[in-house]
A protein has these predicted regions:
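Short, solvent-exposed aromatic-acidic interface loops
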Residues: 77-81, 102-109
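A short, polar/proline- and glycine-enriched secondary-structure boundary/capping micro-motif
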Residues: 61-62, 83-86, 109-115
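Short, low-complexity Ser/Thr-rich regulatory SLiMs
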Residues: 65, 87-93
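A conserved amphipathic terminal alpha-helix motif
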Residues: 104-138
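Residue-level recognition of well-ordered beta-strand positions that form the cores
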Residues: 7-9, 75, 88, 100-104
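Glycine-rich portal/gate segments that line the openings of hydrophobic small-molecule binding cavities
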Residues: 38-84, 98, 131-138
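Hydrophobic ligand-binding cavity/cleft-lining segments
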Residues: 1-38
Length: 138
């Protein structure tokens, strides 16, 4: 298994952050790692979406867990490995909200692909979380 986590605190209210997360079609507005996105349903477990990174191939993903106002998990199943990212809101220091992105790569090929693919997937997490926080704090 390969794993990585990044978090940041913000003064933005959890419901404001959640509003931006739960509007998948708007993700490219604040996430520079997404050139285009197509959603096949509501923001709920089981909904699939196709995310296209800049200069990249479209990736088919699925929401596997949604706890309104708290967390959602998306997953890309590549057969011999699965990339799973949990996006979570937690109480922070002095009334702040902590935004957490955690990615795990699991499955039979995880030890082979994780060390190369994982850092490529998660390299922009600090920038993505910072952009979300800036948007939510407006």
């Amino acid at each position: 298994m390969w794993e990585y986590q990044h978090s940041a605190e913000t003064t933005a209210a959890p419901e404001v952050l959640w509003r931006h997360w739960s509007s998948i079609a708007e993700w490219p507005r604040w996430n520079a790692g997404i050139a285009a996105i197509e959603v096949d349903g509501p923001f709920a477990a089981g909904t699939e979406f196709t995310m296209t990174p800049p200069d990249g191939e479209p990736l088919r993903m699925r929401l596997t867990e949604v706890v309104p106002g708290t967390l959602f998990t998306d997953e890309m199943d590549a057969g011999d490995f699965v990339v799973r990212t949990v996006h979570r809101l937690e109480p922070g220091e002095a009334g702040a909200t902590r935004v957490v992105y955690r990615t795990e790569i699991t499955g039979p090929a995880a030890d082979q692909v994780g060390p190369q693919l994982g850092p490529a997937i998660t390299a922009d997490f600090p920038d993505v979380v910072a952009a979300l926080v800036r948007l939510a704090e407006r």
